[in-house]
Every structure is written in C-alpha cells, then in structure tokens.
C-alpha cells in the first residue's frame, strides 16, 4: 500500500461515519440530475438576464416619456409623480392580488421551501415577480433585482421538477437550490458567489450531498454563461482596479468591519420594524396597501428629478462614488438618506430585494471612512476606494451573516482580486461584532416573520401544483 493510500485511509478513519456515508455513498450522480440542473441553470440565466434588461427598459422609457410627450402638456414634477406611481401600483397590485409570497426579496421563501415549510407556486411567482418587479424597480424605488432573481431561479428549479415529474425529494431539493444559485450567478455575473450563497447562507436548509453540490455548481455556471453571452463578460460594476494595500493599513479595515458589525445588527432590526409598521398601517387591506405603495412610488419619481442619488438599487451609484465625486460629509448624508429610503421601499412589501441597496450603503460609508482615514493618517498610503469595496462585503457579511459569499461577490462584481485580504479582515470583523451583539441573519428573521403571517399561511399553502 502506497503512502498516499495510507494517508487517505487514515483521513477517512478520523471522519464521522455519517459524513462519509452522506457524501461517498451518493458519489454516482445520475445523469438525469445533471441534465436537469443544466436546464435549470440555462432557464434561470435567461430569466435573470432578461429581467435585468426589462427593468432597464422600463427606466429608460420612463425617462424618455418625461423628456418628450408627457412632459409637454403636464408639469414635469406631476408627470414624474404619476408615471412612477403607476409603475409602483402595478407591482403592488400583482403581488397583493395573485402572489403575496412574491413580496419583498423572495429569498426567505426559497429557504422556507428548502425546509419544506413553504410552497413554491412557480406558475404565479414567475410572472408576478417578473412583471411586478419591472414596475416597482422601474419606478425608481430603492430595491434590488438580485433577491427577485434568486426567487425566480428557485421557482424555475421547482417548475422543472414538476414538468419532468421528479418524485425523489432529494432531487427536487437539489433543483430548487440549483435554481437559486443560478439566479444569483446571473444577477451579479458572479458564479462563485451564486454557488457559495446556497452552500453558506442557506446552510440550515441545504442538504449537503455530492449530487446537490454538483447540481448547484452546474446551474450557476450555466446561468452565468447565459448572462455573458447576452450581456458580455465585463464586470457588473466598472470601477478602478486597486493593488493590495500596505500592511500598516489593515487595522483600519478591521475597525471598519467592527463599525459595520454594529450597524448591521441595527439595520436588520430597522428592516423588521419597518415591515411591522407598514403591516399595522395598511392591515392587509388592499385599498390601503395599493394607495400607500403608489404614493411611495410617486414620491420616488419626484426624487429621481431632484435627488437621484437617493433612488434606485444603487449599483449604478457605486462607480460614481468610487470615482471621487463626493466629499465625506455628502457621502454620510447620502448614507443616512439611503438608509431611510431603503427601509421605506423594502419595508412596504414591494417586489424587490435588498442586495443592491446594501452594497450601495456599504460603498457610501466605506468611501467616507476612507476619506476620513486619509485625512487623519496622511503618512499612510490610503486609497479610499479600497474601503468602499471592503464596505460592500462587510455590510453584506454583517446583515446576511455569510462572509465568504460577500467576499466572493464583491471580488467578482468589481474584479478587484488584489483586495482579498482586506475584504476577509473587514468581513470577518463585521460578522464577529454582529454575533457579539446577538444579531440574527436578516433572511432568517424574514422567514420567521413569513411563517407567522396568517395571511400568507391561508393564501399560499394550497395548492402545491398548478393543476390542484
């Protein structure tokens, strides 16, 4: 027996038997599962990529209307208000009338489905999330398309399971997870982050087998290839490429992580508080719900005219920040302002996510921190943009409690691979401080709220298939 074989046997002997059985006994992945995972990834990539293009089309059309026809016979501010109010109305109406589970991010719904506690009515969720998201995001509200893309990807996975009449529960679970991974990979052009998001963030629900891991990888890669074929291979965020920072500055990155850890706990609390306040206000009454949502959308139409930095998901704002167009004071004001607008939009139950708004908040505070650090420590060679990138990963890690996903996500989105060390330090610092303060992951909190929601329990649980 060779030394290598002896080492492998000794290593296996030290591992728990249930782990060995779970992984190695299912080493022979059926070809059908691999094929279905590939199909799920392709469809999730198509849905995610065209959803992004549809949102951009709505936003550009809204701007064109304001510049031409409508703006010629209505005051500009009134036209902006009415258009955005109508777009938001579409999103809120579709959600409240046809698929209440499509409200908000949608990621907690997929996690609940992976745990067997929530149904996936893909025949409702896919059209409602797609067209409702077009309306809500196109109105200028502070919402991200990434959470909806994950939910639609998961819905695609369940759709494929139903169409091909997959009965095996492990396979259905794997395809659901594969769809979620494909959705995130297509949303951010980040296949590694899509894979790791399912494995790390959804770890309480994800069933770790070689089959499920392979399904997730295949789907994420396929979805990302589809994205790149349609949109090209450029990174989602165009920004400067930085070299590795000096070792003497790493302590500042740890401090930034600690600050984001504290803020992440507060931010998660404010999100759930905002949702509770909105529910108490409209009490699930459709007229109140639609009127409130339309008014919010209209107000963001006005903000688009006068303070556009406080509107939209925030991905397009990130390059503007890192190009150095704002001072620290303005950045902190925008940071506070976007906290309020994020809570207002996400808390209202609109069909949109919180990924992109969180990344924008991390960039705002991180760049402001970098500017202040550069002023206080002129002897250090500080690039504020490095702290902006680290801030993106840190806030994601503190709120979602998935530091590895946050690190990979930011690196893939910005192509700043040299910043891996400061990203690790900042993200881990944020997670540690958030845990010390007793904070809980945001999606776990949102899933808990969903399971307590009587309206969702009554309207969403039946039926389980489109024909029942």
Swiss-Prot record:
Residue(s) at site: Mediates proton transfer from the protein to the inner aqueous phase: 201
Intramembrane segment boundaries: 107-114, 175-187, 191-199, 385-399, 400-402, 403-414, 415-419
Stored InterPro entries: Cl-channel_ClcA, Cl-channel_core, ClC
Segments on the Periplasmic face: 68-74, 231-250, 308-327, 375-384
Motif (Selectivity filter part_3): 353-357
Topology of this chain in the membrane: Multi-pass membrane protein
Motif (Selectivity filter part_2): 144-148
Name the UniProt record assigns to this protein: H(+)/Cl(-) exchange transporter ClcA
Alphabetically ordered keywords of this record: Antiport, Cell inner membrane, Cell membrane, Chloride, Ion transport, Membrane, Transmembrane, Transmembrane helix, Transport
Job description of the protein: Proton-coupled chloride transporter. Functions as antiport system and exchanges two chloride ions for 1 proton. Probably acts as an electrical shunt for an outwardly-directed proton pump that is linked to amino acid decarboxylation, as part of the extreme acid resistance (XAR) response.
Subunit and interaction comment: Homodimer.
Any one GO MF annotation of this record: voltage-gated chloride channel activity
Family label: Belongs to the chloride channel (TC 2.A.49) family. ClcA subfamily.
Pfam families, per database record: Voltage_CLC
Location of the protein in the cell: Cell inner membrane
Gene Ontology CC entries for this record: plasma membrane
Keyword Phosphoprotein: no
Organism: Vibrio cholerae serotype O1 (strain ATCC 39315 / El Tor Inaba N16961)
Reaction it catalyzes: 2 chloride(in) + H(+)(out) = 2 chloride(out) + H(+)(in)
Primary localization class, coarse: membrane
Motif (Selectivity filter part_1): 104-108
Residue stretches spanning the membrane: 31-67, 75-98, 122-139, 146-164, 213-230, 251-279, 286-307, 328-347, 353-374, 420-436
Keyword Magnesium annotated: no
Topological region Cytoplasmic: 1-30, 115-121, 165-174, 200-212, 280-285, 437-468
Domain of life: Bacteria
């Amino acid at each position: 027996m060779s030394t290598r074989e002896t080492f492998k046997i000794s290593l296996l002997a030290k591992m728990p038997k249930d782990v060995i059985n779970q992984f190695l006994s299912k080493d022979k992945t059926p070809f059908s599962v691999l094929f279905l995972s590939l199909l799920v990834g392709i469809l999730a990539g198509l849905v995610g990529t065209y959803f992004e293009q549809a949102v951009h089309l709505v936003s550009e059309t809204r701007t064109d209307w304001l510049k031409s026809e409508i703006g010629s016979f209505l005051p500009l501010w009134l036209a902006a208000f009415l258009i955005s109010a109508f777009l938001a109305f579409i999103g809120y109406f579709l959600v409240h009338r046809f698929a209440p589970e499509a409200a908000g991010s949608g990621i907690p719904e997929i996690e609940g489905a992976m745990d067997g506690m929530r149904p996936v009515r893909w025949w409702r969720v896919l059209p409602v999330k797609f067209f409702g998201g077009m309306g809500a995001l196109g109105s200028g509200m502070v919402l991200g398309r990434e959470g909806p893309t994950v939910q639609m990807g998961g819905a695609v996975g369940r759709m494929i399971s139903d169409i091909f009449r997959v009965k095996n529960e492990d396979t259905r679970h794997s395809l659901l997870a594969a769809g979620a991974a494909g959705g995130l990979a297509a949303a951010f052009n980040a296949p590694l982050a899509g894979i790791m998001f399912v494995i790390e963030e959804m770890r309480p629900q994800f069933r770790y087998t070689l089959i499920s891991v392979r399904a997730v990888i295949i789907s994420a890669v396929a979805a990302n290839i589809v994205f790149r074929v349609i949109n090209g291979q450029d990174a989602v965020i165009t920004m400067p490429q930085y070299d590795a920072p000096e070792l003497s500055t790493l302590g500042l990155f740890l401090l930034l992580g600690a600050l984001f850890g504290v803020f992440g706990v507060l931010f998660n609390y404010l999100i759930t508080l905002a949702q509770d306040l909105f529910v108490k206000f409209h009490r699930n009454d459709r007229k109140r719900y639609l009127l409130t949502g339309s008014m919010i959308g209209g107000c963001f139409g006005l903000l688009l005219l006068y303070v556009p930095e406080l509107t939209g998901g925030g991905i397009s704002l990130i390059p503007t920040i890192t190009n150095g167009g704002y001072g620290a004071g303005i950045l902190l004001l925008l940071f506070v302002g976007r906290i309020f607008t994020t809570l207002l939009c996400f808390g209202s139950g609109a069909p949109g996510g919180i990924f992109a708004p969180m990344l924008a908040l991390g960039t705002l505070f991180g760049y402001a921190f970098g500017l202040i650090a550069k002023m206080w420590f002129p002897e250090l060679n500080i690039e504020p943009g490095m702290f902006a990138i680290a801030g993106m990963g840190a806030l994601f890690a503190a709120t979602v409690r998935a530091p590895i996903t946050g690190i990979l996500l930011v690196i893939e989105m910005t192509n700043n691979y040299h910043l891996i060390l400061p990203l690790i330090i900042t993200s881990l610092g944020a997670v540690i401080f958030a845990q010390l303060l007793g904070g809980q992951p945001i999606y776990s909190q949102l899933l808990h709220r969903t399971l307590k929601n009587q309206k969702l329990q009554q309207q969403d649980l039946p039926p389980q298939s489109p024909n029942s």
